[in-house]
């Protein structure tokens, strides 16, 4: 049996993605600008189909003068959320991510994206009213995922620890988790998130659950 020629060039083909202006986006092994986070292109495509970041961006009031805006709320929100989905949790990570061509393409820009300080200011714009509107987006997305009214819904309330490694506001020690942490309350229906409520860890795990359940049931009954 003849031995394979290991020096022979093999055409591995390529994957073409949607263009961004004049930028051609291809998935191949011999390209020019490279990225280790090419999966963000698929994430961006799914998000555009769902319209999740579009809806979330409309929930955040922009206090800046329109004449001085370089990075819009939607592009910054996409940049931050996509980064989290890729495992880049720290704002400092965006010192490099802002120049990543795959991230830029997924977000829908062809220039350098927002810096870490700019993203930090975006996060500080959020208040309780913003959080309320963002949760409405989650519930609306959940409702829109059903073509017909479900016969039954099971809401799963889960309090879990979010460990802290600094002197954050609301930092307390939790004996069960044996660490300083927050104790956020999550509400899921299947694999879909309906609520993520940040709380300090010095409270009972069920605190606020009844009030959140009442609000969710009221909204779901309005639809079904």
Question: Where in the sequence are the language-model features?
Answer:
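Dynamic "connector" segments at or just before major functional cores
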Residues: 1-179, 183-204, 208-223
């Amino acid at each position: 049996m003849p031995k394979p020629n290991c020096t022979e060039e093999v055409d591995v083909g390529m994957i073409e993605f949607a263009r961004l202006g004049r930028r051609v986006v291809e998935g191949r092994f011999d390209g020019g600008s490279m990225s280790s986070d090419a999966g963000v292109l698929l994430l961006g495509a799914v998000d555009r189909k769902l319209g999740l970041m579009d809806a979330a961006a409309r929930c955040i009031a922009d206090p800046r003068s329109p004449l001085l805006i370089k990075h819009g709320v939607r592009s910054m929100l996409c940049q931050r959320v996509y980064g989290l989905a890729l495992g880049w949790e720290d704002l400092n990570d965006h010192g490099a991510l802002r120049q990543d061509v795959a991230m830029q393409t997924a977000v829908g820009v062809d220039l350098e994206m927002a810096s870490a300080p700019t993203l930090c200011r975006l996060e500080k714009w959020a208040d309780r009213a913003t959080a309320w509107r963002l949760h409405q987006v989650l519930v609306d997305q959940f409702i829109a995922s059903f073509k017909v009214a479900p016969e039954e819904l099971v809401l799963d309330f889960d309090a879990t620890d979010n460990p802290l490694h600094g002197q954050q506001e609301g930092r307390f020690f939790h004996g069960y988790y044996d660490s300083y942490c927050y104790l956020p309350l999550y509400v899921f229906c299947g694999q879909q998130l309906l609520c993520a409520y940040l709380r300090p860890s010095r409270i009972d795990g069920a605190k606020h659950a009844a009030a959140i359940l009442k609000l969710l049931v009221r909204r779901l009954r309005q639809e079904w």
